[in-house]
């Protein structure tokens, strides 16, 4: 790769799943994975890319199981939102330890813990090359953190949502179950809907489609994949018009 290559994106929204933070433990936060992700985000900041981050909460709390056991869905979703704030606190701390300026914002007010989400403030911070971690989802029950990622991506006028997963991209079938599954390099929004490919939940996906926000699905466990994505190299699956 030529050393003078420039990033293809100026501002990104990175969506990390909570599960991505748990490592092999199956629960909680793996400190070594957290530190590696912080280093990869630091690389982007050093390239001059403005980074917004949305993190899920599935490594700390899963509401679906408790909902089946009779817990009120709204209560479960509120607990899930708090789990994303806990992940956000951990990520902010890891970034600070890597000497990266980061701010944590929450869609629900948590005075003394982090700032409340403000669109204008988030944009201002991004322009000053601060990493902005956007937690507590949309602040509403019944909306996933994928929906939050697309919503915040549209609000902060990100060039793309980068959805970090445990697989290399979007496949014709589940690669864990079907060895013949092949990966798509590029798809349109309508192709994803026609083929019923599981990229995100429908609410999140249609939000991105309606606002022409590109989505790139890639494997965060692959060292250097995030950098390759922002440099415009072949990595993962790109979904656009």
Curated annotation (Swiss-Prot):
Q: Which GO terms describe its molecular function?
A: ATP binding; identical protein binding; UMP kinase activity
Q: What is its main location?
A: cytoplasm
State which residue ranges cross the membrane: none
User: Residues that bind ATP, according to the entry?
Assistant: 15-18, 58, 62, 92-96, 101-103, 165, 171, 174
Residues binding UMP: 57, 77, 138-145
The UniProt entry, under InterPro entries, shows: AceGlu_kinase-like_sf, Asp/Glu/Uridylate_kinase, Uridylate_kinase, Uridylate_kinase_bac
- What controls how active this protein is? Allosterically activated by GTP. Competitively inhibited by magnesium-free UTP. Magnesium-bound UTP is unable to inhibit enzyme activity.
Which Pfam family name is an example for this entry?
A: AA_kinase
The entry assigns this protein to a family as follows: Belongs to the UMP kinase family.
Task: Give the function comment from the record.
Answer: Catalyzes the reversible phosphorylation of UMP to UDP, with ATP as the most efficient phosphate donor.
- Under which name does UniProt file this protein? Uridylate kinase
Supply the source organism for this entry: Escherichia coli (strain K12)
